[in-house]
């Protein structure tokens, strides 16, 4: 499965990591991924953004901020995680989300922009395995 990154030297990945097809990490700043993290297909993790003003953008001005993904996080397919974001432990990010702000631990969050929907609870436990 293809994996793409800018450098790779600024990426730290914990134990038991799963990254699906077409994972792209633009690591102009540090990217820290915790233990037991699942990342779905076609996910982009971008620490860098171009300037908003045309003169700065044309001059190549960019800004980079770190991204931290906690332990036991699941990021669904086709998500984008933007610069400066922290995703807390045990959180689930729904497919197709654009994460532009910090997401706390232990919640289900999705949307564009991504927002907290509810906490992850024992009611979410799967009791019948198919």
Region locations from a protein language model:
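Short glycine-rich donor-binding/catalytic loop of glycosyltransferases
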Residues: 96-97, 102-104, 114, 120-121
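Flexible, glycine/small-residue-enriched loop-and-beta-strand segment within the central core
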Residues: 3-86, 112-114, 118-130
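Short-chain dehydrogenase/reductase
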Residues: 74, 92, 98, 108-110
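Conserved catalytic segment of ABC-fold P-loop ATPases
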Residues: 88-91, 104-106
């Amino acid at each position: 499965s293809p994996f793409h990154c800018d450098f790779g030297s600024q990426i730290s990945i914990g134990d038991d990591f799963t990254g699906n097809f077409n994972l792209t990490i633009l690591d102009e700043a540090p990217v820290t991924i915790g233990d037991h993290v699942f990342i779905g297909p076609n996910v982009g993790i971008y620490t860098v953004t171009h300037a908003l003003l045309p003169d700065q953008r044309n001059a190549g001005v960019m800004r980079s901020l770190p991204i931290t993904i906690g332990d036991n996080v699941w990021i669904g397919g086709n998500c984008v995680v933007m610069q400066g974001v922290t995703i807390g432990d045990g959180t689930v990010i729904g497919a197709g989300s654009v994460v532009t702000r910090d997401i706390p631990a232990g919640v289900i969050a999705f949307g564009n922009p991504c927002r907290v929907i509810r906490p992850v609870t024992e009611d979410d436990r799967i009791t019948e395995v198919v």
